[in-house]
From Swiss-Prot:
It comes from the Bacteria. Keywords: Cytoplasm, Methylation, Protein biosynthesis. Methylated by PrmC. Methylation increases the termination efficiency of RF1. Its main location: cytoplasm. The gene is prfA. It is found in: Cytoplasm. Gene3D superfamilies: 3.30.160.20, 3.30.70.1660, 6.10.140.1950. One of its GO terms (molecular function) is translation release factor activity, codon specific. Belongs to the prokaryotic/mitochondrial release factor family. This is Peptide chain release factor 1. The modification N5-methylglutamine is found at Q233.
Amino acid sequence: MIERLNIVKQRFDEVNDLIIQPDVISDQKRYIELNKEYKDLRALMDEREKYISITDNIQEAEEIISDGSDPEMTEMAKLQLDEAKGQLPALEDKIRMMLIPKDPEDGKNIVMEIRAGTGGDEASIFAGDLYRMYTKYVEGRGWSHNIVDFSEGTSGGFKEMIFEVSGDDVYGTMKFEAGVHRVQRVPQTETQGRVHTSAATVMVLPEAEEFDVEIDPKEVRIDYFCSSGPGGQSVNTTYSAVRLTHEPTGLVAQCQDQKSQHKNKEKAFRVLRSRLYEMELAKKMEADAAKRNSMVSSGDRSAKIRTYNYAQSRVTDHRINLTLYDLSNIINGDIQKIIDELQLAENTEKLKENSDTI
């Protein structure tokens, strides 16, 4: 393991030198990429120092025990050896996980889309529940979020909700939420007390930078219309809302959340760029998942990933057969335990895949 860590140390020193070079600082794309790499390598260097300290302690203790000339020192060395050997396995496991090649998308911000599926009004209400669950989780993480576009349901909730989330490692955390979520409960409108099953689809798009996707302005049709969103009468009487249509792919992105037409256009372009980027990413994820037979990150938007059963207070994630009887806390934003298990499952898959090199 130390050989692998020493190779990483060489790269860390190289990156440390590169990020202060004028030609790198002037190249925005390269500078951002190297800064992200520096942050990851810095964390590994901290663990490398711990690893060297523990292995040095083991070697020192073994030498004292082997010498045996001082009984008191030998006893102290035995205690030191036991303590150091006890610390080593957990640290080695942590380092192995950190040595897994990181998905370059994981550090990106996201555009998140929630759409009501089968189930009529109840599906819209459930989509609203999911939006509230995610925003509470996002706020708890100290991330920021803002609405891009939405369409309200006739009896509450949303037929569609599109919002941006910004922070550290947002995509790497939230990407596991993409797929079909099902709810099993008695709707408020149900008089016979029958349980209905409804669904909502969640999409998580890594927010593409301008240098990730180049959009030819000639290929984008721009339409302006009156906003139906919040913001008072002035919003509804001016053509501030913006709809973009990317003609080669047919992809559409619109924003009506801001009073400013310019800001709405800017947001809509971010969403369009992210959707184009995600199209390519989904193909790559599908190919990668097929290669390692992964169910955690398959890139399949139609996959049923999770069921929320209100009668049993049960939440089941079907990808990893995880069942938790804690629905009220989960639907109120406490989804970290689910995300932790999904990240662990994906890292375990990657660890098997990279076992020869780590």
